[in-house]
Amino acid sequence: MELTLWTYEGPPHVGAMRIAASMQGVHYVLHAPQGDTYADLLFTMIERRDQRPPVTYTTFQARDLGGDTAELVKRSIRDAADRFQPQALLVGESCTAELIQDQPGALAQGMNLPMPVVSLELPAYSKKENWGAAETFYQLIRTLLKPQLPPAGLSKPDPKRWQEQGRRPRVNLLGPSLLGFRCRDDVREVRVLLDELGIDTHVVAPLGASPEDLRRIPQAEANICLYPEVADSSCRWLERQFGMPTVSTVPIGIGATEMFCRELQELLGLEPTSQGSGQSRMPWYSRSVDSTYLTGKRVFIFADATHAIAAARIASRELGFEVVGLGSYSREQARAVRAAAEELGLAALISDNYLEVEAAMAEAAPELVLGTQMERHSAKRLGIPCAVISSPLHVQDVPARYAPQMGWEGANVIFDSWVHPLMMGLEEHLIGMFRHDFEFVDGHMSHKGEKPPGPEAADPITLAAEANGVDEAELLRWAPSGQAELSRIPFFVRGKVKRNTESYAQERGIINITDEVLYEAKAHFSR
């Protein structure tokens, strides 16, 4: 167990709550003390939902531990079943209740309840939230579809059978859930995309689905794994048991959306059509003269695996950025992240320690950070522009407006989200150049917050040095004359000049960097 200020994922029972709250007709009985009810706020405050998640807590107290807590569990299960009458009942325990070992799932299965009971065994001290969500979704699908399992040896259904039946092909969208990043809008955008291809959306799950909807999953020709963190294990089980192929390309970015369309058309036997990338303004801007300002920008990426891999592909192939750091907190998807990093000549950072991520960020010295809510805080401390691309998120990252990440419109949203911080940085530099004119005041420098004074404001060089075990006395120092001259260099090349000057000084054993050293370094690198 670790005491920390921040965690990227909650315990696995929070993942189970995400699945229950995402669906209709499902209720979750959670064996937990009163203190574990905090998770309700994640849905009412961050997701802006008008109702609590469908969870009943046993809420045992210290005095209950001397008695029969198993009877308390059974009473809570019976009351929840009678009151809510769900189509399916999930039963599990929180990390605290796991220590008591009451095994509420086994108790529920022995109560002869009139609805399907799914017993959840979520090891809280070795697994985390996304795994808990994936395991809950998998167990729910497996329990509900068990009566429909085909006999062994039966041939797999043909994905092109829709042609003989005189209808449009059908696919399922699996993985979107509450507390995911823009899942609601992604589903809407992908539905439109599929309709343009002549494909019907059969079931969307878990978001908005009921247990009866899950029973209809095998009627579709294929499954689309939109969010592997939640749906990968379920898609693989459906492929093994029902022979349903899985479309694994996640349509985030222009290139991935085109690949997604081609993969679906080949799988379902549809006629290839002209791609709809013209609906996005991102390719047009990427070919424009204005976009040359973005070329070569150094970007650091840390997010869940799905969005981190997609962001790395978009940044390197579609926007011409230089990816200088790539990582994820998703240990279950670490292999895919490492493969994506190797393609870029990087070593992936797989960690759930935000301080380690911040140190790596500082060492990479990027001009843009793409990450979670925590990376936004870290980037602000370091004075680096940042865009949030993944959960965990804050309420400001759950907009009321339509803002998908997938499909053609998603490419527009991504482009705006990533480029605007860089453009604002250019504006910041121009304001800084003229800030001494009478019509400008310091209060105008507002958009990204200056680094606070004092020891709390960690310098990027210091953080990188600490990460590498370098003594602070051995660090390079910028003299006031050198800092003044560096501040006159335009924002969009200042980082490169700073790195080159420090490299020049280190090679020559210069510790104090003055304006003269900066001039010498500039002359050296311009030869």
Swiss-Prot record:
A GO molecular-function descriptor: oxidoreductase activity, acting on the CH-CH group of donors, iron-sulfur protein as acceptor
Active site: 290 (proton donor)
PANTHER family assigned: LIGHT-INDEPENDENT PROTOCHLOROPHYLLIDE REDUCTASE SUBUNIT B
Cofactor(s) named in the record: [4Fe-4S] cluster
EC number: 1.3.7.7
GO BP field: light-independent chlorophyll biosynthetic process; photosynthesis, dark reaction
Superkingdom per UniProt: Bacteria
Source organism: Synechococcus sp. (strain RCC307)
SUPFAM superfamilies hit by this protein: Helical backbone' metal receptor (SSF53807)
Signal peptide start-end: none
Pathway: Porphyrin-containing compound metabolism; chlorophyll biosynthesis (light-independent)
Keyword annotations of the record: 4Fe-4S, ATP-binding, Chlorophyll biosynthesis, Iron, Iron-sulfur, Metal-binding, Nucleotide-binding, Oxidoreductase, Photosynthesis
Residues reported to bind [4Fe-4S] cluster: 36
Complexes and interactors: Protochlorophyllide reductase is composed of three subunits; ChlL, ChlN and ChlB. Forms a heterotetramer of two ChlB and two ChlN subunits.
Functional note: Component of the dark-operative protochlorophyllide reductase (DPOR) that uses Mg-ATP and reduced ferredoxin to reduce ring D of protochlorophyllide (Pchlide) to form chlorophyllide a (Chlide). This reaction is light-independent. The NB-protein (ChlN-ChlB) is the catalytic component of the complex.
Catalytic activity: chlorophyllide a + oxidized 2[4Fe-4S]-[ferredoxin] + 2 ADP + 2 phosphate = protochlorophyllide a + reduced 2[4Fe-4S]-[ferredoxin] + 2 ATP + 2 H2O
Record-given protein name: Light-independent protochlorophyllide reductase subunit B
Residues noted as binding substrate in the record, renumbered to the chain: 425-426
Family statement: Belongs to the ChlB/BchB/BchZ family.
Encoding gene (name): chlB
Bound cofactor: record note: Binds 1 [4Fe-4S] cluster per heterodimer. The cluster is bound at the heterodimer interface by residues from both subunits.
